[in-house]
Amino acid sequence: MHASLRTNLPRDLMAFFDFPFDSSGGGIDEWPRYPGHAQVLYYLEEFADAFSIRQRIRFNAKVLQAVHDDRWLLTIDGDNGSATEAFDALTVCNGHYTEPRVPDIPGSDHFPASCVHSHNYRSPDGFAGMQVAIVGTASSGADLSQEIAVAAERVYWCGSEKAARLKKTEHLKNVISCGPIRSLIDDGRIELEDRTLIGPVDSLVFATGYHYRFRFLSEHLIQVRDNWVTPLYQDLLCITQPTLALIGLPFKIIPFPIFEIQARWFARMLNGEFGLPTASRMHEAKDSRAEQLRSAGILQRNYHALDNEQYDYYDRLAQECGDSPLPDWYRELGQAARRHVQRWPGCFRDQFLDVHGAPTRYPQS
């Protein structure tokens, strides 16, 4: 996590609904509306303390294997060695920002430039005076292109949607937006898909996402196919063993509220408060969703990207489990925050956003 990292969401939008991101919950009123990573950590620690969560966590315990045989049998490696324990249900919340995803680019074996993934990036200091190429056009690629440009002599920002990215870096004269990479050359140059050559570069930075990994689960339960986790109902529940839920798989979302409704949905299902469709119906829903995405030209590795669909996804889970739908202000603020980024792509975190959500105390200018 790099030192200057800040959220790309206003904190009144990203908070858990029953725990505001200010002094009435887990924050400080004077913090910026787009807080830094240390402030997000503070908020989460306050949340854990407020709801006595720490005492329910077993720290320094690694799950080596999880198998189902009437109950879930977990082999856990802890401070006192390994042991197997039994549980009625299993919720996997191991995240998906740990194992970097680096594309296999022809020529990479003999490419002389240093290569690093954004997962290991900390600051631009090590790029002073360099020619740098950055691969990846999502939030991390945008942030790193702007930050590294302050130190580097030149930054080549490579990937799709070249025209759409120009506004994000137009204020930086040493950032050049380029198309996708075709191959890497042994003299440090890079060949783009249109056969254009750029460089040579001193460093290549991958802001290309992460892999989903569940090494403790058998593949007969969960498979990962080009970063699509299947077979799941509602991007959440294992169809073949519905006492297994995977919380937090979707991306391009407002995380904490989505995690919250997923957890409530699973808890209420386990408690018998609503029934599931038959396994065949859940498979049909999963297959129909995949076909819808495929027909829309969505790559399989992006099937878990919700983006603007996340509001309907939340309400769908809420309706199914008998919870309240999103409050009226939530979608409005989410869409306003999106427009805010489009209006101020290079500096949106420091510009005033005049749409407000839940009562949250933060600087008003």
Predicted regions and their residues:
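Conserved beta-strand positions in the Rossmann-like core of class I SAM-dependent methyltransferases
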Residues: 156
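Glycine-rich dinucleotide-binding loop and its adjacent helix/turn
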Residues: 21-26, 32, 36-43, 49, ...
